[in-house]
Amino acid sequence: MTVNQILNAKGKNVYSVGSTTTVYEALKIMGEKNIGAILIIDGSELKGILSERDYARKIVLKDKSSKETFVDEIMESTVFTVKLSDNLENCMELMSSKRIRHLPVLEDEIVVGIISISDVVKAIIELQKDTINHLNSYISQ
């Protein structure tokens, strides 16, 4: 299964903010959209990613104000990405080795989607269902 197939199943919605957005405003969007991370994009350039984990570690635990802190101060600027043609195994390997939960999807340096650990798990479950159905059909012949 490819990243493109996963995005076709889940949708290609991408939520982002600019680097001068406050953490509070970014969190507000994350809450409204029920997402665990938001991309930081200036123009069409991916600058970073802000996750709930970043907020907890860099705002809450350091007793900072989310209304007075900009996302570029706490975002993760080293962003690991995948392409539409990458496969599910590549996503799992990258998420596991880098200990991350979200992978922006780029095509020609433009963000076209984002894959979460939840999307990967759902894809694995679907693949297992297909395998079980195939085996059941084979056995019943």
Q: What is each stretch, according to the model?
A:
Residues Y24, S44, E73-I74, E109, ...:
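Residue-level signal for alpha-helical context at structural boundaries
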Residues I6-I40, S44-L46, D54-K62:
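N-terminal first-folded block
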Residues M30-K33, I38-D54, M95, L103-S118:
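A glycine-centered beta-loop-beta connector
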Residues M1-K12, S51-F80, N87-S96, I117-Q141:
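Tandem CBS (Bateman) regulatory domains
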Residues S16-N34, I41, T81-R99, L106, ...:
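The conserved cystathionine-beta-synthase
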